Amino acid sequence: MGVIPTLDLLRNHIDISNVPFSDRGSRLLVFQTDKTSRLHVKLAERLTSIQPDIEAYLRRPPFLSDISLIDEQGNALEFEVASSPHVLTFQTRIGEFRLAFQDERTMSFGMPDGTASGIRFHAAPQYWEQTRLGGIFRSVRNLTYNSNGQILSNSITPVRGGYQVEILVQADQDRVINVAIHPSATTEPTEVLPFSSIMEMSENRWISWFKRVPPVDEKYARMYGYAWWVMGNNLISPLGEVAYEAMMPSKINYVGLWLWDSALHALAYRHADADLARNQIRAVLAHQLPNGMLPDAIYDEGLVYTIDHPISGSVTKPPILAWAALKLHETDPDVNFIREIYPQLVRFNAWWFSMNDDDNDGIVQYTHPYSSGLDDSPLWDYGMPVESPDINTYLCLQMEAFTRFAEILGQQAEADMWRRRRLSMLRRMVKDMWDEEAGLFWALRDEQPLRVLTPFNLYPLWTGQLTDEMNKRLVQHLLNPAEFGGPFTIPTVSRSDPHYDPKTMWRGPVWANINYFFVEALEKTGRGELANKLRQHTLNLISEHSDVYEFYDAETGQPPATAANIFGWTAAVFIDMAISAHRQSSNQEQTNE
């Protein structure tokens, strides 16, 4: 019997010292400060109009800090916090304070009934910087605060680094202090509703969210519920260049939308909200360049098409939008959506071949390492460009999806063309990259093999079009404990390779999305039992932890310190795998009856 997650299932699962309390659509992140009785609020915004460095947000201090809950005398209260997806509850010596989102820009603090109580916080509404010739001051965001209680005191005091704000109210029943952070020039305070109404609205939003998701096996229910919370919590509303409601990989570490992340996020959303899944794809396609290229990343104030490190060049991400769109169509058919996106995806496909094949041999290259999504992989240690099996496999899969799209749209001649092109490309990969002695596909640099052993050397398995003998050789590598097998699989560099580092990003750790791709590859080649084992292994690896992480140590299964938490595609593929596992077990039960 499958279970569907509930709010109770996630009570106190969200650790706000490490994981932001936020809400669907919001760019406000509430944290507990260093396990103390204080809070702070960060902004999930790059704000490049203030600091042009596109990664400055990673180092930016909180917008609001030293948030304290105070008593009648203005004393800061110690608290114990309890978390739920819809509300934080702070137990103090004078009663319960609560915090919920009234809307995506308004944090509502519910005061303990029958008390004189309030909040105090430090606001830093300006950014300043000393320069060689002087200094710069820029506004960050506007802030308003107000209450539906009788105000006993209200002070704004200039202090070093900003302003200290203190507001104390007579808290009869349902009294609230609202703090709103505005993304525009507005300074109109938000309407203050009774806290019971605010909490009911917040609770109903999350109940509605969880009601839409399919059931899974009970052993995965808690992490499954948390993964769906991440899929909701990481959503941001349309603003600026973000044209649709879309999901950030992490509101802490990855502010913006990334191309291939968006495709993987759509995998999960298709099970609960197909329109939201479609909008993940639309949000990326909205910014296609005239030459067909799609951006690496999109954020409120801009787009990332080029990067100047480790080399300068154009940057995108692997072309898996068509693959994801086909999966979405299989779950929730929409011919009009296929008709809408097909021409743009064809242009993106053409860009890869026209701008990333310097030797004109029909094998596509990565010109910038970051276009691979495998930023620090040892595949790029020896210079660029690199003709890698993974990008050419992605393109084969894209053309496989195009074949289906053309058939769906009644364009049979075009479907036949894509089928021929896909098989022709695969033949070139076999001719140029296959090493019969090694039993794998090498990446090429200056037409010479790069003998760095990674799972990406096995990627053509995923096409489902190789000979049985080739498939067998590739799977042998996958299962070899000295290479990619072992207790924690699949490492992103072979354990036998001198570049292997189990803790460092794409130089060895296990990534859930790569495992997902190989589950599909094994299924396509008729190895269902191995696919099930890898699926169960991946589900168990992720379930061992209280959060969903970017990657996992290939020796210990633990998330390294550098791995982002509340990570989107790990949550997404966990959801998709858990649903598949449940459907398989349900089918097995029916067969046995």
Language-model segment annotations:
Residues G149-A180, E218, L294, Y299-D300, ...:
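N-terminal start-of-domain structural block
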